[in-house]
């Protein structure tokens, strides 16, 4: 809430002050359906200092209209900005569909003139022949999770967790693929453009991806400094 208020030009108190008041009132505890977040390690060997350097992607199941029926969400995230750079919903998992999505995302983001690392787990769509051929043509460096390490794709896992614990998540499933696509489109719009991400200093993924976060962070710093100067004993 402190960064959100700061972006409106308002400062009420620091994060520590809010937590102190919550503790005093016995209100500092985990809320919602999610489990408390767990710190995740990034993919081994690769770090990003800017957008379009390292992407990670995965597929998750979306519940269909009846038990045992699923739709499949293919989703790509830039680990520097946390922006969703590509997504599609399909009725099956294949390397061919994944390869087409990767190609579209690379062209849309203009990553053709720079080396790109693409991290994934070891599933068959991720390592299929079509996928490997597409990555070679696009000059993409492949990175895969370590064998027998189930949580080695942390950025995708965290994003799926955020997705499935949204308040409007349809617990009874999606009636059609079109319904699933519409919901994911709305989620991606909110996530990229409105969600203040804790891992990137509470700016939106879209702002960080475009480099617009710098001005926001400077404005916040000025606001906080002015607040401290007015109340030096806080």
Stretch-by-stretch model annotation:
Residues 1-234:
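Charged DNA-binding/catalytic regions of mobile-element recombinases
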């Amino acid at each position: 809430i402190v960064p959100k208020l700061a972006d409106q030009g308002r400062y009420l108190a620091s994060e520590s002050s809010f937590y102190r008041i919550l503790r005093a009132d016995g209100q500092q505890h985990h809320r919602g359906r999610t489990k408390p977040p767990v710190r995740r390690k990034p993919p081994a060997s690769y770090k990003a200092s800017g957008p379009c350097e390292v992407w990670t992607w995965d597929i998750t199941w979306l519940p269909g209209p009846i038990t045992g029926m699923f739709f499949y969400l293919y989703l790509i995230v830039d680990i520097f900005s946390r922006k969703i750079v590509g997504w599609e919903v399909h009725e099956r998992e294949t390397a061919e569909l994944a390869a087409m999505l990767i190609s579209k995302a690379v062209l849309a983001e203009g990553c053709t003139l720079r080396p790109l690392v693409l991290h994934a787990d070891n599933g068959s769509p991720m390592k299929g022949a079509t996928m490997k051929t597409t990555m070679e043509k696009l000059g993409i460096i492949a990175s895969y999770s370590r064998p027998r390490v189930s949580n080695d794709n942390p950025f995708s896992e965290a994003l799926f967790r955020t997705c499935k614990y949204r308040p409007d998540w349809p617990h009874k499933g999606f009636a059609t693929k079109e319904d699933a696509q519409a919901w994911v489109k709305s989620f991606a719009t909110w996530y990229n453009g409105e969600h203040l991400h804790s891992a990137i200093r509470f700016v939106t993924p879209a702002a960080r991806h475009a480099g617009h976060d710098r001005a926001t962070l400077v404005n916040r710093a000025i606001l906080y400094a002015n607040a401290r100067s007015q109340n030096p004993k806080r």
